[in-house]
């Protein structure tokens, strides 16, 4: 089996149900399955983004969970898809609609990326702080967007407040992603031969012992 090493320019990563499929359907003509259930996406959905400065291919990577680098929740399959992209869009639920901390989520996902392959964690990232239409803050309370910017922009990771449902903030995010791609080293597309040890064992005349 010959396998395409690079499947997309950009990979969407994040925990399940943060809006990756909705984002993909917003920015491309792709029609991924969208539902309010974890693991709705079980294989990458690809779409083409067109901007004034050119287009790029984007892949909705199935939602990651803690332990993915150890194979939990089909983790190795999911991480292998991310390995084949050049820029990462990290989508988080900025409104914490499921009670999750978006800052904590980003660190957890990046920890899984680094554990699987440190080179992936070093690739250009941008944070899409999604579901801003669902954010409600008390008077004097710091907004989750400001918290994300304060945490990650000093590290060189830009944060864009977006709504995948309404499209707010999406255009600016896409232009930044295109700039990141333009500044990336273009890696050649490589075909690899898949290796399955069990096939090798079956094809060889190995000695056996009956006890």
Predicted regions and their residues:
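Conserved G1/Walker A P-loop phosphate-binding module
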Residues: 1-72, 76-88, 92, 174-178
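Charged helix-capping and loop-helix junction motifs
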Residues: 72-74, 107-108, 143-146
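Glycine- and Gly-Pro-enriched alpha-helical subdomains that act as flexible
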Residues: 94, 100-107
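Short amphipathic alpha-helical/adjacent loop interface patches that line ligand
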Residues: 46, 82, 106, 113, ...
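C-terminal-of-GTPase-core extension/linker across diverse P-loop GTPases
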Residues: 1, 5, 12-13, 18, ...
């Amino acid at each position: 089996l010959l396998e395409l090493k690079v499947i997309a320019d950009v990979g969407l990563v994040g925990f399940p149900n943060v809006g990756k499929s909705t984002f993909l359907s917003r920015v491309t003509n792709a029609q991924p399955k969208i539902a309010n259930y974890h693991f709705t996406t079980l294989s990458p959905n690809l779409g083409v983004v067109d901007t004034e400065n050119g287009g790029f291919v984007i892949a909705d990577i199935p939602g990651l969970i803690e332990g993915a680098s150890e194979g939990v929740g089909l983790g190795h399959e999911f991480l292998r898809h991310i390995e084949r992209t050049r820029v990462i869009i990290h989508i988080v639920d900025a409104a914490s609609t499921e009670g999750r901390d978006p800052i904590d989520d980003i660190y957890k996902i990046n920890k899984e990326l680094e554990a699987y392959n440190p080179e992936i964690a070093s690739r250009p990232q941008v944070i899409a702080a999604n579901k801003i239409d669902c954010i409600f803050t008390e008077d004097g309370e710091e907004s989750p967007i400001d918290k994300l910017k304060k945490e990650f922009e000093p590290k060189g990771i830009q944060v864009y407040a977006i709504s995948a449902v309404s499209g707010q903030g999406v255009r600016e995010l896409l232009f930044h992603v295109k700039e990141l791609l333009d500044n990336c080293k273009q890696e050649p597309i490589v075909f690899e031969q898949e290796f399955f040890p069990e096939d090798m064992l079956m094809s060889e005349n190995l000695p056996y012992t009956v006890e």
